Amino acid sequence: MKYIPSILLFFFLLSFSSCSTKTVESELPEPNPPTPVIPEEPTPEKEKMLWFDAEANFERFSKKENITYYLDLAKSTGFNKIVVDVRPVQGDALFKSSYLTPLTDLADTHIERDWDYLQFFIDEAHKRELKVTVSATIFTAGLPSSKNGMAYRDDTWDGKTCLEYTKDQGLIDIKDDKTKVSAFLNPVLPEVQDFCLNFIKELVTNYNFDGFALDYCRYPGDESDFSEATKTAFEQYIGKQLDRFPDDIFIWNTDGTKRTGTYYKKWWEFRSMVIRNFVERVRTEIKNVKPDIQLEYWAASWIHAIYGQGQNWASTEYDFSKEYSWASPEYKNTGFAGLLDTFLCGTYLTKIFGLNDPESIEYGIARAQRIVHGACKVYGTLYALNHKDNIADAVYVCLSQSEGLMVFDIVQVIEFNQWAAIKEGIQRAESL
């Protein structure tokens, strides 16, 4: 049996020899996957808006061919959005409404249309890839100069227009004050707010547009409103009874200045809170119907001078009381920038350059950005009449130093033939 181990040895050596002929490959590391190339998000094109005022263009845009002609011109100039004003301060409407009277008469002009003014603008603008913001004045109700408008023909509004506290005439209804641009309804009244919300909701529901701009969404001035309804609302706001109203707020001096009363600062705070709370209601109504519609608001850039109108378009982060003697520490809580998508900053100033010059467009935009504090977008806006010869520079500053541009109004752009200059300003800003 000695041959058995020999055979086993033979096979063992054979197997070893076979294994030794194999090439042993070293393990290679897993290759690193290539880094994915993520395309950069394109920078959104800034909005460049041209305003079509209802009153100034009432006769011109009574013809469809005029509308399409100027939409073409706006597009070729570089605008990508228009603002269609559908309710001027007279208070009637250029859209189909169950709440407002159709606007057929303005000054000495009578126009009746058998077509929908707003719908035509929307359709033709969208054909040209122009976005549309619809603008409406909010608390306006007629013209004191001519006693024309809803406040004068409908006794529903008797006692609901603002009661002014004036230096020379005492308490008077704003309807009888021919120095005022419009007979304002009293913003504090629930029935007034509900009425305005109804026509806003109607607009948003029945028409498809891209933005809604609040205009004249404010008090008419520091003389209004001193009605019993406002006195009661103010007493509820501060939790105290007023013994001497309106002297508790201020007394007019013979030179037109004011002698401040006990509740002077709280009064401005209260009125701004009325407007702030109404803007919040508007936002809720709009977003409930069409969440994508952008809420916009136009106001003058000189915010320190319009507290008498109840317009605190700043962020709640900005404390006015540290800079202005008229502001309470709580005034900042009335800021409504955070309720807006876009603030249309009214830099309607003749000077363009000068970051340290409070009378310049550059300063107005920079201040707005500082006190809005990122709560919403800020667009620089221009009054074309102020820039007959230098609108290119004004357009350039607004577009390069803010998040968008609005030019008011097409009537001046037409009158002074500013199309080419505006286009040059847009192109200069977009070449940066």
Language-model region placement:
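Bacterial Sec-dependent N-terminal signal peptides
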Residues: L14-T43
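Active-site-adjacent "subsite" loops/lids of carbohydrate-active enzymes
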Residues: E41-F61, V134-N206, N253-Y264
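Catalytic domains of carbohydrate-active enzymes, especially glycoside hydrolases
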Residues: E65-D92, N206-D210, N333-C345, Q401-L405
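Aromatic-lined carbohydrate-binding/catalytic grooves of carbohydrate-active enzymes
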Residues: F79-R113
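Aromatic- and acidic-residue-enriched segments that line the glycan-binding/catalytic groove
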Residues: L94-L106, T140-D176, Y216-D255, G308-D319
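Aromatic-lined carbohydrate-recognition surfaces of secreted/lumenal glycan-active proteins
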Residues: K131-F139, A213-P220, Y264-S325, A375-H387
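Substrate-binding cleft/loops of secretory-pathway carbohydrate-active enzymes
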Residues: A141-P144, D222, V289, I293-F353, ...
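Substrate-binding cleft of secreted/luminal carbohydrate-active enzymes
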Residues: W326-L432
